Amino acid sequence: MRKIELLCPASSLEVLKIVVIYGADAVYIGGEAFGLRAKAKNFSMEEMAEGVAFAHAHGVRVYVTANILAHNYDLDGVREYFTELHNMKPDRPDALIIADPAVFMIAKEVCPEIERHVSTQANNTNYGTYQFWWNLGASRVVTARELSLKEIKEIRGHIDDRMEIETFVHGAMCISYSGRCLLSNYFTGRDANKGACTHPCRWKYSVVEEKRPGEYLPVYENERGTYIFNSKDLCMIEHIPDLIDAGIDSYKIEGRMKTALYVATVARTYRKAIDDYLESPEKYEANMPWYLEQIKSCTYRQFTTGFFYGKPSEETQIYDNNTYEKGYTYLGIVGAPNEKGLYRMEQRNKFSVGEQIEIMKPNGDNVLATVLALVDEDGNEMESCPHPQQVFYVKLSETPDEFDILRRQENEAIALD
């Protein structure tokens, strides 16, 4: 059996530290340029260096996305960026995730000691393509999202055994082929292939065919329109044995725009599912209700297995709404205690003294607790923490640890903007 890597996203230094603590084997991040998540917080070079050092201290690898489809004017900047990564101290990133052949060759020239992984944006759909990238010096290829497990297993059997295969196993699905979308360009002038996607696939649409009056296309809709591009979220937590059988090395979680609560929950759950299965398939099956309960505790759009078991049916789409299911509200991350035994936090959503909340721990435990006190930075007691990103100190009826996450159960649906 090949060694399994759990690869998780991080939008910021704070989230990187969380996913490292909550079970990731590797983390993928974006710098301030040349990745495909321009709206994410992303990392400055200083933050990236600190994040790489933190991850390496915990035995976790870090991959940096540079997967834009480059234009002529990008190439000099790419070279400068890779030179900075090459010179990063005390540690460099472990790999670059690249889609464009020109960007790949610049990386090979400027920072040959950093591994090169080929992004799903490169539309990697056959074993000849994988071998092509291997011959050019790639150590890993990310599968196109449109591949079935059968096809991935066939690829595994035809390529060099040293080459690694990475596959998205959980998260939001793009409606376009391997993420190469022009809807955002067309409607808003913002280039999805340069990291500026406005997600028009989630908008509300009504279909009109002006040249065919009286002829109605068979689309599903409600009174607000139709959601013909609105895919369910991918979830393979119930199919770990099939992922292993296909020969996949790295199980990738989508979500560089997600909160620390989301990525921590998903990382912790997949970590336990993988470890349970490797310890005992029977234990994995017995714990399946817990995995599903935890996965559904964070925001999601309903689940699908995507293309893994063949061409998706109409059941893969959501036609009647554009809402997330929301199980919990993210309140914040527990920091270090002060001399009075109160724990430092930065507010992510409002909560109040007397509320019952939940302490989410990296080991899988969820501990109910009551908020006993809230104190601002000047030592003044507060009844609540109403201000976004407000720094304060909290006392709970149960003792938390640094990097625990506080959350509040909601169980509601929230509309997407």
Regions found by a protein language model. Give the residues of each.
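Surface-exposed amphipathic alpha-helical tracts and adjacent flexible/coil segments at the periphery
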Residues: 1-22, 26-33, 51-52, 58-88, ...
